[in-house]
Amino acid sequence: MDATACNESVDGSPVFYLLGIPSLPETFFLPVFFIFLLFYLLILMGNALILVAVVAEPSLHKPMYFFLINLSTLDILFTTTTVPKMLSLFLLGDRFLSFSSCLLQMYLFQSFTCSEAFILVVMAYDRYVAICHPLHYPVLMNPQTNATLAASAWLTALLLPIPAVVRTSQMAYNSIAYIYHCFCDHLAVVQASCSDTTPQTLMGFCIAMVVSFLPLLLVLLSYVHILASVLRISSLEGRAKAFSTCSSHLLVVGTYYSSIAIAYVAYRADLPLDFHIMGNVVYAILTPILNPLIYTLRNRDVKAAITKIMSQDPGCDRSI
C-alpha cells in the first residue's frame, strides 16, 4: 500500500493493536491463558533450577556448564520478552502496545533468537575441543576464552537485528496499526505498515537465513569432526562415553532447529494466518521448556546436582 494512504497519528507515533489469534473464540481465552501461564512457570522454574545447580555445585564449574548457564539465561529472557504480554492479552484483553514498546519487543525477540543460535555453536565448539583435542582442552577452553566466546555470541546477536529494527521504525503506519500476532514479531509488524513491505520482508528473510543456517552449518561441521574422532576410539565403552557427553547438546540443537522448521513451514503463503501465528508461538515456547528437561534427564552431572539440591533439608542445622 502507498504510504500516502496512511492515516498517521499527529505526533508521528502510531499505536500497535495485537489481534492475537484471530479465529480463536473469546471463550477459549481463559484456558489458553492458563496453558501459557503453566508453560511460562515451567520455563522459569526449569531454567532457574539449572542456574542454581550449576552455580551451587563446584563439580559443574566447567566450560560446558558455563555455556549452559548462558543458554538457560537466554531461555528465561527469550520467553519473558513475549509471554507476559501474551498472558495479559488473553486474561485482560490488553492488546495495545506503544510504538517504542513494540519495537523493543521485536528487537529483543530477534536478539535472543540470534543469541541462542550462536551459544549453541559455542557449545558445539566446546564439545569438539573436548573430544578431538582432549589434552589441549584445559588450555584452549580456559576461563578467559570461555568468557570471550560467550560475550562475542551475545554482542553479535545484540548488534545483528539493529538495521532491520531501524528500517522497520522508519516505515509508515496508521495511527492504530493492527498486528496479526500475539506479540511484535518482525514480519507481522512489517505487514502492519502501509509502506511497501517487500524490502523489509526480504531483509528479515535474509537475516533469518543467515542466523538459522550458518550456525547450523558450523554445528554440523563440529559434529563431523567429533564423529570421526569417536570412530577412531577402539573400545565400545570409550565411544559410548564420548557420545554421551554430546547427547544433551545434540538433543537441544535438534529441538531448536525443529522449532525453527515449524515456524518456517507455518509461514507458507497457502496456509491460514493462524498457522503463521501458532508456528511462531510454538517456536517461542518449545525450546525454552524442553532444554531444562533434556539436561536434567540426559546429563548425569546436572541430574545429580539438582537431586542433591532438592534433597537438602532446609531445616537442618548449619555450622556457624
UniProtKB/Swiss-Prot annotation:
Gene3D superfamilies: Rhodopsin 7-helix transmembrane proteins. Disulfide bonds join 102-184. Detected in the keratinocytes of the epidermis (at protein level). Detected in hair follicles in proximal outer root sheath and hair matrix keratinocytes (at protein level). Keywords: Cell membrane, Disulfide bond, G-protein coupled receptor, Glycoprotein, Membrane, Olfaction, Receptor, Sensory transduction, Transducer, Transmembrane, Transmembrane helix. One of its GO terms (biological process) is signal transduction. Its main location: membrane. Induction: Down-regulated during spontaneous, apoptosis-driven hair follicles regression (catagen). Residues 1-31, 84-102, 167-200, 267-276 are extracellular. It holds the Pfam family 7tm_4. It is a multi-pass membrane protein. It is found in: Cell membrane. The chain crosses the membrane at residues 32-52, 63-83, 103-123, 146-166, 201-221, 246-266, 277-297. It comes from the Eukaryota. GO terms for molecular function: G protein-coupled receptor activity; olfactory receptor activity. Residues 53-62, 124-145, 222-245, 298-320 are cytoplasmic. InterPro entries: GPCR_Rhodpsn, GPCR_Rhodpsn_7TM, Olfact_rcpt, Olfactory_GPCR1. Olfactory receptor. Activated by the synthetic sandalwood odorant sandalore. Endogenous ligand is unknown. The activity of this receptor is probably mediated by G proteins which induce elevation of intracellular Ca(2+), a cAMP-dependent pathway and phosphorylation of MAPK1/ERK2, MAPK3/ERK1 and p38 MAPKs. Activation of OR2AT4 induces proliferation, migration, and re-epithelialization during wound-healing processes of keratinocytes. PANTHER family: G-PROTEIN COUPLED RECEPTOR (PTHR24242), OLFACTORY RECEPTOR-RELATED (PTHR24242:SF253). Belongs to the G-protein coupled receptor 1 family. This is Olfactory receptor 2AT4. It comes from Homo sapiens (Human). The gene is OR2AT4.
